[in-house]
From Swiss-Prot:
It catalyses: ATP + H2O = ADP + phosphate + H(+). PROSITE patterns: ACTINS_1, ACTINS_2, ACTINS_ACT_LIKE. Keywords: ATP-binding, Cytoplasm, Cytoskeleton, Hydrolase, Nucleotide-binding. GO terms for cellular component: cytoplasm; cytoskeleton. The gene is ACTA. Pfam families: Actin. GO terms for molecular function: ATP binding; hydrolase activity. It is found in: Cytoplasm, Cytoskeleton. This is Actin-1. Actins are highly conserved proteins that are involved in various types of cell motility and are ubiquitously expressed in all eukaryotic cells.
Amino acid sequence: MADDDVQALVVDNGSGMCKAGFAGDDAPRAVFPSIVGRPKHLGIMVGMDQKDAYVGDEAQSKRGVLTLKYPIEHGIVTNWDDMEKIWHHTFYNELRVAPEEHPVLLTEAPLNPKANRERMTQIMFETFNVPAMYVNIQAVLSLYASGRTTGCVLDSGDGVSHTVPIYEGYALPHAIVRLDLAGRDLTDYMMKILTERGYSFTTTAEREIVRDIKEKLTYIALDFDQEMKTAAESSGLEKSYELPDGNVIVIGNERFRTPEVLFQPSLIGKEASGIHECTFQTIMKCDVDIRKDLYCNIVLSGGTTMYPGIGERMTKELTALAPSTMKIKVVAPPERKYSVWIGGSIQSSLSTFQQMWISKAEYDESGPSIVHRKCF
């Protein structure tokens, strides 16, 4: 389908960040927040060339006067008009390409509603007139990027986490576990527990400040109860953060209480399993012969796995769950924040992948439902 000289575009639309770039590159060209901001107030200065909507970094920088909305929630697109704006911004402003000249690879969370992919396909072909496209599962691409063909991927982003077992390149769909608990829930939880300290964060713009605090200062405790004791007895764990207006706030046990939710979702009232239990459940749903290979190839990917201490804690929790003789290895590649994108870049530049694309002709013949037949 695609000629060898046309570079494919790889777009990893996360709930929190959009990563986009060209196939064959080793890192995404453009990484910007998946947000659309609309002005809260009427513009009164003539000639200011005000827009009705801002996307990505521009929305982030003007966040004080905007209402920020994320069109993707828990990995599912909830607002297609805003999603179209984000894609338009990706192609024309960030990558500066004409989408009608390049095949496009998109990514998706597993166990998503089928209508979500169909709509994605429809917009790509009908609004952006792409010559070809493909949709792949995020975790599968992360495994590509880690150079393995077998492993259990724990992919946790801003909107959704999932564990996917892959054996010799085949994903085992019956064993996928999806957890609607990820970075955004942690940010919301942090907003809540900072209120206990007397710091109130309420607006959509302030939520972004809390996200920044979360990304810079939090870590995962190896032993949560022990860490709580330490924090209560001394102020050694306290760190300060300077807000945009110059005020300095001090945070203590919030630093490790926030990401603890990943292991104990009951802290935010979610009746779900922690990420370690999800990984264990996934492996237990697989054939008994391949479990050993999965236990020693647990690959972390996505921005919510960037917390310091996550690998050690994961190893400890899984060792407690798994049979005592089992060797457990948790792999946390340094580039895991972008490993989905990197995997997409690798996959779409493989010569064997070229016949996998859904072409415009196939779409015209079968309509959006072709995506279920051709994509995993």
